[in-house]
């Protein structure tokens, strides 16, 4: 996710960092728009997005507006545009969160993951796996693809998919303090 140049720092002074394309037109600069609308977007995102993601969703909505500011600033209600973008992004995050939760339930290890503190910690462990293992785990468990479908998607052999799944399961089991079952 890309962020505005001043995210995490003070925004530039009026006219001090944005090109004239972003400070002219209808008398409102993007900086003024950002300052006025961001707090409301965060509140909106908190109502719609999974916990802990509201600020990211609001920032991403502002990035959408920033990239299209030349067009958006000419709208009668640019704030409606950015609120809709925020709503769409929050719903997407919520759906992603639900997909992870469903995959977690299908994995057959909810009691084990609950010992870790919940699905967030489990998916944090998944993110520590090597890239190919992460891909295979996500496609197989989140998208519920068969081994053959995962192989076609990643353009690797079915045997490679099985090896990556097996290694990922073993690594995750060790990380969670479970007995590692060797698959034959």
What are these regions (language model features)?
Residues 70-73, 85-106, 115:
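Arg/Lys-rich amphipathic alpha helix in sigma70-family domain 2
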Residues 121-129:
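Short amphipathic alpha-helical boundary/capping segments
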Residues 41, 45, 54-65, 85, ...:
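Short, small-hydrophobic-rich alpha-helical interface motif
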Residues 87, 91, 154-178:
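DNA-recognition helix of helix-turn-helix
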Residues 2-14, 19-43:
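A short, charge-rich alpha-helical start-of-domain segment used by transcription regulators
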Residues 136-140:
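A short pre-motif secondary-structure segment
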Residues 23-32, 42-60, 69-76:
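Short, charged helix-capping/linker segments at alpha-helix termini
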